[in-house]
Amino acid sequence: MISQSYRILSRISRNNELKKTFLTNLNCKSSSPSIIRSFCKKQNLDENFEYTNKLEVQELKHYIPCYTIMDQEGVVSKPDQDPNFSKEEVIKMYTTMLTLNVMDSILYDVQRQGRISFYMTSFGEEAIHIGSAAALEMSDTIFAQYRETGVFMWRGFTINDIINQCCTNEHDLGKGRQMPMHFGSRKINLQTISSPLTTQLPQAVGSSYAQKLAGEKNCTIVYFGEGAASEGDFHAAMNFAAALSTPTIFFCRNNKWAISTPSKEQYKGDGIAGRGPNGYGMKTIRVDGNDIWAVYNVTKLARKIAVEEQVPVLIEAMTYRVGHHSTSDDSSRYRTVEEINAWKEGKNPISRLRNYMNHKGWWSDAQEKETIANARTTVRESLVNAEKQYKPSINEIFTDVYDKPTPNLIEQQKELIEHLKLYPDEYPLNQFADSKLILKD
């Protein structure tokens, strides 16, 4: 009790009248937990916990449940929670997932052939992409990590956009400045992806805080993996969002592996979701990331809360990364084929939605084959065309840095051009747009 009294005194030490009142109460009555609690509440020093004279070490008592409504056979357990999309909408969702899967397979092999420098697949996480994206508005802002390609596709980012970026040609929206998989598009409100892990989380909070100050009825969603939640920026972002009450949706893709580190070595306790309610006072939901309808419902609710209540929401989507971390990784070195197949066959998000469609008579094997064939043709034709294009102009190295080029930037540009003129045979200048015009005397 004495330590509690001193703590309260330290908080009110600059207010002599309040301090006098507290000491009077303390001297006249027993300094029981109820007296201290009553005084704090009366003087607006309330804290959201009870005082007690029972010495007890707290431990984890319960785990946040994982919300799911559709099993692997495509059966919805609670029909009233089925989003009831139309046949056309469900087919669009399914074909987008299937197309993403086909594109990932082709571009992974293309990287192995040396035609692009890098690639990351989304095998096993397709329901997270489409389910969450379908629940958002186009006016919402997206900060992604690097495994959310399906989200962008749903919002209108085309296969050509994706492949042009991977080939870094002159049609790349990023003007060839980023490595593959680092997409960005003002048109679909996608902030450009950056490589450093978790930097997008504090940025997303800043974005949503700006939306709040502007009185917008939108939110910002930020995607990240459970490995990113081990970074310091995760805490900074969560704390800022909670303290400032920003309309931010924190969407964690818990796919069990942070490159080669399993989730059991990333954290203890109740995973990522467990940090939300007690750690940051944040509304939190855990969801089956391979159930597209559960993901949709959860994201829809999270958006409603974020926009209407102007508070952040944490979502932890439980899934599994079926593919390698990237083309720079060989996951056979740290996990078994049996583990991969157990998820690939037992909790496959694509086949789960296919089964749902089968029950309704909306899909056939012929449609499946046609969709896969069309996707392969589209991806291959896009790739062939992208490889024929020029690389961005050499001058693009210096654009978009400042509104108007600074003297030192102009000098650097001049020095580069002079260097290229001096050693033209050392560089593949014929691959770059406008190179002849730029290097002309």
Swiss-Prot record:
Its EC number is 1.2.4.4. InterPro entries: Alpha-ketoacid_DH_E1_comp, DH_E1, THDP-binding. GO terms for biological process: branched-chain amino acid catabolic process. CDD domains: TPP_E1_PDC_ADC_BCADC. It comes from the Eukaryota. The keyword Metal-binding applies. Heterotetramer of alpha and beta chains. Belongs to the BCKDHA family. This is 2-oxoisovalerate dehydrogenase subunit alpha, mitochondrial.
